[in-house]
Amino acid sequence: MAAATLSFGPEREAEPAKEARVVGSELVDTYTVYVIQVTDGNHEWTIKHRYSDFHDLHEKLVAERKIDKTLLPPKKIIGKNSRSLVEKREKDLEVYLQTLLKTFPDVAPRVLAHFLHFHLYEINGVTAALAEELFEKGEQLLGAGEVFAIRPLQLYAITEQLQQGKPTCASGDAKTDLGHILDFTCRLKYLKVSGTEGPFGTSNIREQLLPFDLSIFKSLHQVEMSHCDAKHVRGLVTSKPTLATMSVRFSAASMKEVLVPEASEFDEWEPEGTTLGGPVTAVIPTWQALTTLDLSHNSISEIDESVKLIPKIEYLDLSHNGVLVVDNLQHLYNLVHLDLSYNKLSSLEGVHTKLGNVKTLNLAGNFLERLSGLHKLYSLVNLDLRDNRIEQLDEVKSIGNLPCLEHVALLNNPLSIIPDYRTKVLSQFGERASEICLDDVATTEKELDTVEVLKAIQKAKDVKSKLSSTEKKVGEDFRLPTAPCIRPSSSPPTAVPTSASLPQPILSNQGIMFVQEEALASSLSSTDSLPPDDRPIAQACSNSMGSLPTGQVAAEDLRDLPGAVGGVSPDHAEPEVQVVPGSGQIIFLPFTCIGYTATNQDFIQRLSTLIRQAIERQLPAWIEAANQREEAHGEQGEEEEEEEEEDVAESRYFEMGPPDAEEEEGSGQGEEDEEDEDEEAEEERLALEWALGADEDFLLEHIRILKVLWCFLIHVQGSIRQFAACLVLTDFGIAVFEIPHQESRGSSQHILSSLRFVFCFPHGDLTEFGFLMPELCLVLKVRHSENTLFIISDAANLHEFHADLRSCFAPQHMAMLCSPILYGSHTSLQEFLRQLLTFYKVAGGSQERSQGCFPVYLVYSDKRMVQTAAGDYSGNIEWASCTLCSAVRRSCCAPSEAVKSAAIPYWLLLTSQHLNVIKADFNPMPSRGTHNCRNRNSFKLSRVPLSTVLLDPTRSCTQPRGAFADGHVLELLVGYRFVTAIFVLPHEKFHFLRVYNQLRASLKDLKTVVIAKNPSARPRTQGPLAGGQPAKSRVSAEQRLQETPAEAPAPAPAAAESAAEAPAAAEASAPAGAPAPAGAPAPAGAPAGAQAPAPAQAEVPAQYPSERLIQSTSEENQIPSHLPVCPSLQHIARLRGRAIIDLFHSSIAEVENEELRHLLWSSVVFYQTPGLEVTACVLLSTKAVYFILHDGLRRYFSEPLQDFWHQKNTDYNNSPFHISQCFVLKLSDLQSVNVGLFDQYFRLTGSSPTQVVTCLTRDSYLTHCFLQHLMLVLSSLERTPSPEPIDKDFYSEFGDKNTGKMENYELIHSSRVKFTYPSEEEVGDLTYVVAQKMADPAKNPALSILLYIQAFQVITPQLGRGRGPLRPKTLLLTSAEIFLLDEDYIHYPLPEFAKEPPQRDRYRLDDGRRVRDLDRVLMGYNPYPQALTLVFDDTQGHDLMGSVTLDHFGEMPGGPGRAGQGREVQWQVFVPSAESREKLISLLARQWEALCGRELPVELTG
């Protein structure tokens, strides 16, 4: 044998004799158990046996080994549990066991060895059991390449037995030959050795202290050891040539114990292949193939020089040790992945000199405070710094410039509790912020927007600090202490101070990227005129998108957004067509100007000039006001002073436009006549200093602009006035400029040159300021409450402006400016939403999370779709004559308020499940002290389920092209209503589309889809959304908004997922030279002859759709005649060929590269509505299963939603499309598939009750086809194999293979979806239920089910009506009876989430008849094709349904009743499946003939 050549040392002494002692007994129930202690050398263990076990052992030994029959003490029946008998028997049994051990001193018989647990604890028994196991399964294990797990005790037993030098088969049983083990270990590749921490089993054996030798393994590629003492493990070094992966856990105190066990024998050693620098005692071979080493969870305190022996290592895991310093890793040139988490590292100085090529570095759970040592790890891709002590944000700068870094984790550091922690950290990465995944959370669009703002803020601060450094001395000489003008350097950060635990809303500054073309072309913002440090700001967003030529940023960004027609150059001079009636009156902020900030020196110089001119014009009024305030302060009381200030304020505020030049000259001449010029100048200077806190000359020459805010402004002074504005915050006050409405659609140069000064006021005239809506609307009250400015802009800029304004006031003055009516900067939009929903008593309002809020105008008005004879809907929309303002007044205000109300913006606030429409009250704010819950009552809320909100598919044929339409107008379909949303801020439309599409895609279960009535009117082609979201159709219409004080209930069974209306295939196949279809106009920036953007189907493989798929879907698209249909389903059923594929991709598909695989018509039942069976068109794709449902389900669930939005109207009735409900079950959510008896139906089960649906195909062929296609699709969803070699991942590749095999009627698919088929137990349950309902089950022979089919019972219609309704039934045919049952298809078998059994039984017997009582069978085509009428003789003596009286078969309204006079009972049954129908007739005729001796009469009727 192979063992003959093995030698582990001299032969050991003879083994000590084994002993077995009975040390006690226990009474268990009614019998006694004897406790036996077995000793084998130093090892001992305890076992328990009752007397009957001894008796069985003795019988087998007598039979096999012929021992003395009287050796075992006799059995006693009476008094067997008496104490005296038990004690005597203990002694006798101990003598018996000792005798057996002496009889068999070397090798115990097999039965005795198992009785004494030798196979678990004794050396020979352990090796014999292992050898027998490998004899039977060894080849199978080696062939499968699976991991073989072995215990240290087994390895110890093998080592000990080899060292004893005994024969390899001492027992004489060839199966237990030690050679089987050695043959197996020589070829094994994947080994796992797992010990235990404490004693093993009932023994005193501590496995972690047992020595063993691994040199018997000759071909190891991968080994894992845990809870073994590395000092006692020998022979592992013999696997150096082949071992590629090694894991040693809970076993080592140093790396040398594992990598250089020879180090304990040699003082000086060097790795093989290195140049020897001095005397050494040994040259040790390296680990030639080792690339992965896991030494985690040990007690390693240093990375010693043993790493020199693993030069090819790529993956090194030293986590959960005690490493203090990163050292010696410079020898690992191939190291790519290093895990040093949860050690004791406190410094990383010089770590880049030791980790040159590392891509993944895990430093979590250490004591790190500084990251400066990481700044040169240029190859780093993944960095984990969780659970450290990093406090300063500046530390992130050390890794901010690493060019390859993609994933960073900083959670559970002191740094992570900073407000806006994510955006501030991301801003440290500069232009690469979009590529960084922070804390395992992908960077969102809103975070990138905030990062851009923070970068711009930082750049502005840098520029500001440079400018202030040159003028600091001048400013200090002339600034008075009473009016701090310049924001102190110690002011807090101005980013949005929201809580880190609350999701921030979408920050609306993305529009900066849309003005880069104009900004670069403008003479005011040309990069040539900017300082070198400022040039990156003007192109920040452009650079972040790549080095694109000028003019392409806006167009390409717009093309990537669903709902956007295309990018339009701001300089494009094409005439605008009014998108909605009265749209010329709409006030909006153009996006061509928001790129001009306080860092643009030319722009700032122009603003300074305008402000200086305005101050000179307003100087007399300010001087007069200052003088009067001084006099009032000294002579009059507080009330008179307020009255005079009010009079003065009326004369000095809101001066519009530049004054006449002649007036200025005349005024100047009059002043010279009244006073001496020098005295007047002195008086003006002193008064201005008193009023503004600044020297006049310095003010006029050095106006310091702190912040420029482009915004939408609502000014309330008795009446409401709205205009697009530019607010300029200076160190003395605030200046307001208006963008003339007629100029808002021009180029940026035109807009900037036409800026009109409105008014300005010093800081001292500001009485209150705060947020009407946190992060959305800032309010400034100027001197008197009726003069109020409502500032609407994006959150980041508003907070920046608010923070800069606060810094202009001393802390003691801020308390006077805070308002109890307004919110402070510390309140988040999420908190405001929670308070608002609580005020309106919305259920679950505290759980709602704001995903974005957008100011819009909402318009609704009637429009009529006029269809031509050719069926072309494009361009045939007639708008009712109305103006925008009147439309908004009618829709948004009560009739009594319509005359007083102006067209003011609303806010669309998106949450995960709802679209919230918020209307704010912009009436004059009350004075201080009159706060009485005004901030709650001043908002009106209307909520619409997001599942009912769609982008209007008719948008392409109703909305003209143009910059205004592209950037501000979006048409929605809310329920059955058409609503036009006009966004007042730039780029907000595109943010809304991004968030809307993400939320729609995340909705579960039910969603609303649009199905075009005519292929020519299908939703237009749109580009894919960035981030892989599905394309959506656009919106067009004017709709009146109605408000409801409470939330509208969401449709059950669940909310809807996104309606993915991808482009139609007909457009995809258009030739390159063909003009773009009317529904998909080419982008404005493209040449006139250019083709429209490639539709979504261009993403899928070229062979899709194949001709076979087109043909099969056409053949399968045949709706059964018995299923009720609605117009939308009728339309689908009429489609043929490629039109079906087009419908799927234009209206149903979720993602761009999704492919349709199968189509099925069936009725379905949902878990939440078990009593409702509804028709559905089932579409199986590569991503999900879609159920397009009958409109009856919508009516069933929409009763509580019959509000303004959900009432059908002429707009919808005349529209070129249908609105349908679609249930979506994503394949990733699918957990199990239950197949019904005889394949008559199947149930798809997800993770929740809303994701359980049963398809009642009532046809085994249809069920089989669907399941076959489903398995094929699921197979394509299997996880892709690891790119590493197979040998690297033996845990997953060679683990437990339990998929793809049928066990207990369950098939675990390779995708982990469980397919459950009917078991014999299920058939037995059905048989039992039927048998129990029979009159005398005992007298009847055993039932044998011949046929089980899902059918319908035709109910006899009332007179004057058409064909009777169908009632679902289960028809069961046995050898002698036929039954009709009511079956629960949806609740059984119980889903895993079910906590209690259903209220209904699975089967309820409705009727039963004997086959011999069947008189004849009638087959006709009226009212249903080939419906069967089974005519029975109603005999009195039949033994079925004995408990049911004849009244059961009497005439009842809508019931089956009797067919006529006489003693006959008729069952009118409709079987949809022709195959099942023929099988029923065939089996019924055969059984009837066997029972009655003649052929069954089958008659054909009309």
Curated annotation (Swiss-Prot):
Gene Ontology terms, MF aspect = identical protein binding; integrin binding; phosphatidylinositol binding
Q: Which Gene3D superfamilies match?
A: Phox-like domain (3.30.1520.10), Ribonuclease Inhibitor (3.80.10.10)
Biased segments, Acidic residues type:
637-648, 660-683
Residues recorded as bearing Phosphoserine in the entry: S542, S544, S547, S1282
Record's compositionally biased regions (Low complexity) = 1045-1101
GO CC, one annotated term = cytoplasm
**Keyword Cell membrane on entry:** yes
List, as start-end ranges, the regions of compositional bias called Polar residues.
Answer: 540-549
InterPro entries per the UniProt record, alphabetical: Leu-rich_rpt, Leu-rich_rpt_typical-subtyp, LRR_dom_sf, Nischarin_PX, PX_dom, PX_dom_sf
Return the annotated region ranges for Necessary for homooligomerization and targeting to endosomes. 121-693
Record flagged with keyword Phosphoprotein: yes
* Coiled-coil segments: 623-692
Q: Where in the cell is it found?
A: Cell membrane; Cytoplasm; Early endosome; Recycling endosome
Predominant location: membrane
Q: Where is the PX domain?
A: 12-122
Modification Phosphothreonine occurs at: T1280
Q: Pfam families recorded for this chain?
A: PX (PF00787)
Provide this UniProt record's keywords sorted from A to Z.
Answer: Apoptosis, Cell membrane, Coiled coil, Cytoplasm, Endosome, Leucine-rich repeat, Membrane, Phosphoprotein, Receptor, Repeat
- Give me the ranges of the annotated region Disordered: 481-501, 524-549, 628-684, 1014-1101
Q: Where is this region: Interaction with LIMK?
A: 659-867
Stated role? Acts either as the functional imidazoline-1 receptor (I1R) candidate or as a membrane-associated mediator of the I1R signaling. Binds numerous imidazoline ligands that induces initiation of cell-signaling cascades triggering to cell survival, growth and migration. Its activation by the agonist rilmenidine induces an increase in phosphorylation of mitogen-activated protein kinases MAPK1 and MAPK3 in rostral ventrolateral medulla (RVLM) neurons that exhibited rilmenidine-evoked hypotension.
According to the UniProt entry, the note on domains is: Both the presence of the PX domain and the coiled coil region are necessary for its endosomal targeting.
Q: Can you state the subunit structure given in the record?
A: Homooligomer. Interacts with GRB2. Interacts with PIK3R1; probably associates with the PI3-kinase complex. Interacts with IRS4. Found in a complex with ITGA5 and PAK1. Found in a complex with LIMK1 and PAK1. Interacts with ITGA5 (via cytoplasmic domain); this interaction is direct. Interacts with PAK1 (via kinase domain); this interaction is direct and is increased upon activation of PAK1. Interacts with LIMK1 (via PDZ and kinase domain); this interaction is direct. Interacts with LIMK2; this interaction depends on LIMK2 activity. Interacts with RAC1 (activated state).
What is this protein's name?
A: Nischarin
Please name the source species: Rattus norvegicus (Rat)
